[in-house]
Amino acid sequence: MKNKLLIFSILILCTSSCNYLEYDESDFLEKDAVFSSFQYTRDFLTNIYSYVPAAFGTIGGDALRSAACDEAVYVDKLSPVHSFNNGAWSAINTLDDRWNYFRGIRAVNMFLQEVEGQEFDELKHNEDYEDIMAQFKYYPYEARFLRAYFYFELAKRYGDIPLITTLLSEEEANMQKRTSFDEVIQFIVDECDAIAPHLPISYKELIKSETGRATRGAAMALKSRALLYSTSPLFNKSGNIDKWKSAARAAADVIEKAWDFGYMPLPDLWSLWNNNYSNNNELIFGVMQREDNWFERVNFPIGIEGGGNTGHCPTENLVESYEMQASGLPVAPDAGYEHMDPSYNSQNPYEGRDPRMYELVAQNGAWWVYDEQVECWYGGRSGKPQKNATVTGYYLRKYVDGSTSLKSEFVTSKRHVWNIMRYSEILLNFAEAMVEAYGDPNYKDGYPMSAKEAVDIVRSRVHVDMPPFPNNLTLNEFKAKLRNERRVELSFEDHRFWDIRRWKIADQTTDIYGVDITKKEDGSFSYKKVLVEKRIFKDCMYLYPIPQSERYINPELEQNPGW
């Protein structure tokens, strides 16, 4: 953690939707000059926002953490993400290294120290001074939210971490010991409680040109997520029921404010990630990308006009988790609970499934852009043995904007919204915490709804229309089906990678399956489930290793067990 106190290099780049800070070594400003200027102070805070990942934690440039769990296989065999799966990562060969969040934390600590009592005297005679100060009053609370978010991202990876809330010298910072995971989570919870009342419900009427900033709901949602993780088996080894109750209460607090905050499950799933941020009533906290076609270039299927590089291939493991729509019953015994739908036909596997599956994958025969069909069968234009063909029999559709053109004569770009927290997650957080705390899916004394009612809201929204959970499920069946619902609803949103760790089931997810598809002489297809990868997972991998480079700098950092 470097200590750079005196100079800042600032280059301001403004767009219609947001403000950025970029550093340029040709321009230098002393610290006092930065924090005596409202413009530079605002840009300093905006730069702290840049530490929030704009895409779900890309590894090696393009791969998502979905390819490091049982959601996907990444087709490029040279991608570093494969080291997650073959056990070739270590404290020296780190992957997804987020220790640099401490830079963001240090920036927050500096920001809070320097802006305290600031009134920007040189602007007091400006006509817009009151508007400026109305914006500025939120800045310290936004910064504290970001610090809490960074600490959560660190804690879920590394467990115990240094907890630093003041600006330290370089020597002091490099002698900090690790604080227990529970203490870090309690700090996050306390911060969220303290800052939430001071943050606005929305910025739409306050600062119309800026979106993606921390709100009251974002602070409350972060508390919900932090408590859910802390009470899960990985971190709650004693099974403390009171922790589950606290997690349920935190999620309930968001649900009870949903109407006031304007949150609701969005019926148009496509709009969750390919729409204007301000029109997304389900989104609680996220990042809007500039217009580009990077994700499409990485993930468009091969073989179609203007095709891409295939990228992420959803697994048969994930596809099997999508139930039959009419019955709500699974198509495989490990997809929820054992009562399978007898009408499911493994040789016509994609008919009548959960509508969310069609938003996730492009399966064999699916229509793609330009009125072309995806041909995943052996010998098809999108299938083996074509170079970069899908290795699982599926292509990724989620987040891919089908209206984007990659044709050489007409290349277009689109905006993407990366959902970091959304309302359906809160409903699922609540359902999980409630059923673990009270052992009854229908219990709701003192709460806005029961676990069953919460999950049924997610399933019953327009354009999903999945049947409610059956009333006759055993407790264990309900829990299994609920975990499957979370897997389905939040697929490719950077949850599954962490869920299988906090539930301590990652060692059960190492067999990765796809389908081999053969086209018959009569034009029909046969489908065969096949093992694609057998991955490696050791107990030490439930937590990341502390980067050895940081331990050389700070000898007080003890390594996580097994690394």
Where are these regions (language model features)?
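Flexible, polar/acidic helix-loop-strand segments at domain edges
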Residues: 342-423
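Short coil/turn linking the two alpha-helices of tandem helical-hairpin repeats
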Residues: 153-157, 162, 203, 229-238, ...
